[in-house]
Amino acid sequence: MGNENLRPWERQDGETEKAFSAFKAYLEMEDRNVTSLAKRLSKSRQLLVNWKQKYNWQERCIAWDKSLQEIEYKTAV
C-alpha cells in the first residue's frame, strides 16, 4: 500500500510507531510547538525536529485542519 491511499494524518509508510505517536500528540496541540512537545514526551527536541521534517508534519497538520474546517462547514450549512 502506497502513501497515495492514506490520508495525510494517518500513519505513513515507513513511519515508526514512536514517530506517529509523537505526530498525533503534535497534531492535538493548540500551539503545535516542538519544544513543548519534547518536554511533554521526554524526547529530545532534535529528534522531534527530524521526525517533523522527515514525515512532513507541517503539511499533514494543514491537511488535518482543512479537513476539520470542511466538516465544520458542512455541519453548519
What are these regions (language model features)?
Residues 1-77:
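N-terminal, charge-rich alpha-helical recognition modules
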